């Protein structure tokens, strides 16, 4: 049985892009008598190795941002303890304030820091911090919460999606929608847009139709915090392109799966999401401060204020690299415009890096993903006050958590059961997953794990004031109110599973996918190339790997071996590239080449994401020079390295790639040697597919063609020129 896609691990380290090189190299050639190893154990080995490494390093780390401040805190404890004793003898009214600003005549502000040892120890213990118990900002300290809230508050609007979705949902209506979702009853609507986008909207079936929201062309129509309106208007004088059709559902707190992310529209989508996340955090804080003031004024009344969750973090970002995290932070600060950013230098020093100038020839999507610091092991907490944003805040004092799936899971799934913690995800109200296709190439199992632990009831109170917890939290219905937004360059079965399994928003959900012209129409070659797609029958996804392997060895490989044998000694005998999307399929085919009688006279090389750089270079050289007739090549290796393989005269695709850009790039290998271009065009491309490859195949051959190729009864071979 084939493993779920994206299960291969990623290693830790500063340069985590590309083959991690943790497996022993494998070289096999019947002609050259190159030794083979026994690295066909699948993917469990590297996963355990990297996870154990990450867990070991995290055992001493508090649940918080990537770089903890434990050493710094310890160094300050003796002084703080002495200070506490002095304060006890001189001021018995209470602990010293943590921060206070002193205004001088020259208008310079000097910040005097007096640490409260008790508060410090509470933070170390990951204790008791939620929105009500947040550390006071300068204006909120000393009873000035009313003034602080008034300066930056807005009148509540019954039409504000924040209030209608989170604050004032009707309990009866909410119960009806949750019941419909639990019974998987949805009303659906579909439409196509002139921008080449297909939309599918689903709402809980409570009698209402799934209507469409009008396009959002002006950001002024969004109910924004007063502080955000001006910078938002400056950044978005108008919303253009596909974003204007997606924005209404984002700001309307509906679940969104957007499958048309590109390097050209990613910045606009990132800014929209940053504005939405910041707006949500500020409104949450504003409601809490207002209610604090009301409760302080009316202490003798029976006010029932429900404005909080169990813990403070409200927004979760899942991102592929540290540089992607920095870009998201920059988008947030562009709108929030804080007067002070604590630990910003530390953030830039540890999360940001310059682009590699040698990558100018790489594709745009590669440079966007791997440019700068491409480390995929990180987590970062952001804490907001009225004028300040603090980076590297502990999770239980953070408003926004940004992390890679690997970085977050190492905290949640530590080897020591007692240290495992996921309570900080109990009150997440907005989840943003950007560049999900890149996360698929890391390890999708981490995504699944995190999704399953969202909005669970916390195991500890963490200082929660349960009298102010919203009712739908107490009823364990937070997952039905939570908003999830996922951006990806293409939609896969794994992402569709998230859409159907974890997107249960009572306000509805939307999936947007592009109408594909097909990668076969955009080949970077000056001549036409024969492209043949062969369908094989398979009854279920579980049987796909065996059926694919049987068809490959009995039909395609037998023909390839005959051609190589008949052309031995001729230039045409070599140059066959076999592209294999799955690593486990790669291992299976590689072992067959190494041990089967069928391939006794075939010299071959094999390179994957685990092959050492030196071994990969040697295999590429042998293949280019004709010393090896066949080269096995994986999709994840191409994703991380984007090699330009020379010497390719024919291409066999064991399966079509997930990323349609890879199809064009790999077929483009045929044109790297102009002298052999005509011969390569005759050799062409041959690809295998089954009905379970429908999503991938649609991106390769186009939306209009894929239906006939799946249903065709008259034959199973389709050729395009």
Curated annotation (Swiss-Prot):
Similarity field: Belongs to the UTP25 family.
Compartments it resides in: Nucleus, Nucleolus
Gene of this entry: utp25
PANTHER family tied to this protein: ORF PROTEIN-RELATED, U3 SMALL NUCLEOLAR RNA-ASSOCIATED PROTEIN 25 HOMOLOG
Assembly and binders: Component of the ribosomal small subunit (SSU) processome composed of at least 40 protein subunits and snoRNA U3.
Phylogenetic lineage: Eukaryota, Fungi, Dikarya, Ascomycota, Pezizomycotina
Region (Disordered): 1-171
Pfam families: Utp25_C, UTP25_NTPase-like
Bias-annotated ranges (Basic and acidic residues): 21-33, 104-117
Gene Ontology BP annotations: maturation of SSU-rRNA from tricistronic rRNA transcript (SSU-rRNA, 5.8S rRNA, LSU-rRNA)
Biased composition (Basic residues): 7-17
Keywords: Nucleus, Ribonucleoprotein, Ribosome biogenesis, rRNA processing
Species the sequence originates in: Aspergillus niger (strain ATCC MYA-4892 / CBS 513.88 / FGSC A1513)
Example GO molecular function: rRNA binding
Name of this protein: U3 small nucleolar RNA-associated protein 25
Free-text function comment from the UniProt entry: DEAD-box RNA helicase-like protein required for pre-18S rRNA processing, specifically at sites A0, A1, and A2.
GO CC terms of this entry: nucleolus; small-subunit processome
Feature: compositional bias, Acidic residues: 54-73, 118-144, 152-161
């Amino acid at each position: 049985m084939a493993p779920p896609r994206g299960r291969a691990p990623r290693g830790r380290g500063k340069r985590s892009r590309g083959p991690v090189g943790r497996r022993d190299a494998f070289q096999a050639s019947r002609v050259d008598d190159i030794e083979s190893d026994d690295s066909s154990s699948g993917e469990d080995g590297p996963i355990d190795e990297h996870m154990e490494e990450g867990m070991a390093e995290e055992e001493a780390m508090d649940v918080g941002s990537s770089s903890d401040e434990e050493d710094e805190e310890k160094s300050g404890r003796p002084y703080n303890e002495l200070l506490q004793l002095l304060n006890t003898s001189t001021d018995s009214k209470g602990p010293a304030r943590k921060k206070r600003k002193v205004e001088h005549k020259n208008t310079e502000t000097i910040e005097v820091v007096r640490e409260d040892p008790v508060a410090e120890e509470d933070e170390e213990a990951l204790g008791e911090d939620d929105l009500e118990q947040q550390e006071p900002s300068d204006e909120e300290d000393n009873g000035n919460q009313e003034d602080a809230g008034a300066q930056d508050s807005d009148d509540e609007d019954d039409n504000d999606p924040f209030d209608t979705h989170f604050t004032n949902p009707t309990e009866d209506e909410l119960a009806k929608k949750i019941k419909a979702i639990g019974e998987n009853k949805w009303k659906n609507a579909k439409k196509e847009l002139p921008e080449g986008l297909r939309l599918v909207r689903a709402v809980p079936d409570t009698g209402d139709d799934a209507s469409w929201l009008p396009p959002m062309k002006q950001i002024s129509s969004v109910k924004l915090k007063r502080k955000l309106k001006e910078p938002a208007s400056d950044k978005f004088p108008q919303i253009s392109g596909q974003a204007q059709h997606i924005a209404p559902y984002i700001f309307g707190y509906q679940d969104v799966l957007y499958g048309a992310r590109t390097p050209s529209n990613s910045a606009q989508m990132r800014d929209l999401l940053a504005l939405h996340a910041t707006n949500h955090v500020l409104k949450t804080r504003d409601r809490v401060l207002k209610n604090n003031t009301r409760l302080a004024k009316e202490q003798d009344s029976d006010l029932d204020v429900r404005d909080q969750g169990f813990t403070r973090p409200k927004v979760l970002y899942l991102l592929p690299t540290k540089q992607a995290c920095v870009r998201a932070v920059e988008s947030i600060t562009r709108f929030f415009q804080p007067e002070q950013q604590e630990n910003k230098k530390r953030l830039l020093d540890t999360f940001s890096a310059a682009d590699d100038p040698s990558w100018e020839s790489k594709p745009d999507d590669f440079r966007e993903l791997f440019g700068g610091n491409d480390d995929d092991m990180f987590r970062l907490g952001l804490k907001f006050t009225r004028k300040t944003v603090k980076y590297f805040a502990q999770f239980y004092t953070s408003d926004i958590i940004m992390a890679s799936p690997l970085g977050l899971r190492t905290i949640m799934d530590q080897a020591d059961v007692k240290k495992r913690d996921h309570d900080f995800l109990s009150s997440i109200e907005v989840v943003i997953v950007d560049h999900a296709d890149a996360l698929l190439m890391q390890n999708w199992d981490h995504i699944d794990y995190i999704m399953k632990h969202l909005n669970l009831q916390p195991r500890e109170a963490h200082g929660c004031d349960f009298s102010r917890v919203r009712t739908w939290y107490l009823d364990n219905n937070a997952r039905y109110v939570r908003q999830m937004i996922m951006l990806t360059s293409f939609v896969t079965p794994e992402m569709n599973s998230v859409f159907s399994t974890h997107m249960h928003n009572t306000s509805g959900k939307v999936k947007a996918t592009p109408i594909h012209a097909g990668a076969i129409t955009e080949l970077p070659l000056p001549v036409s190339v024969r492209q043949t797609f062969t369908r094989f029958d398979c009854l279920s996804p579980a049987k796909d790997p065996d059926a694919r392997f049987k068809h490959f060895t009995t039909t395609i490989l037998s023909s390839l071996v005959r051609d190589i044998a008949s052309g031995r000694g001729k230039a045409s005998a070599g140059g066959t590239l076999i592209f294999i999307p799955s690593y486990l399929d790669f291992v299976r085919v590689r072992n067959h080449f190494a041990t089967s009688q069928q391939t006794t006279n075939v010299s071959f090389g094999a390179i994957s994401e685990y092959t050492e750089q030196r071994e990969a270079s040697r295999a590429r050289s042998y293949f280019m020079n004709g010393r090896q007739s066949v080269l096995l090549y994986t999709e994840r290796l191409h994703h991380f390295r984007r090699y330009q393989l020379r010497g390719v005269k024919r291409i066999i695709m064991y399966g079509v790639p997930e990323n349609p850009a890879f199809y064009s790039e790999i077929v483009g290998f045929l044109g790297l040697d102009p002298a052999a271009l005509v011969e390569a065009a005759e050799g062409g491309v041959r690809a295998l597919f089954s009905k379970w490859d429908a999503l991938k195949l649609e991106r390769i051959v186009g939306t209009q063609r894929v239906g006939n190729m799946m249903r065709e009864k008259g034959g199973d071979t389709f050729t395009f020129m």
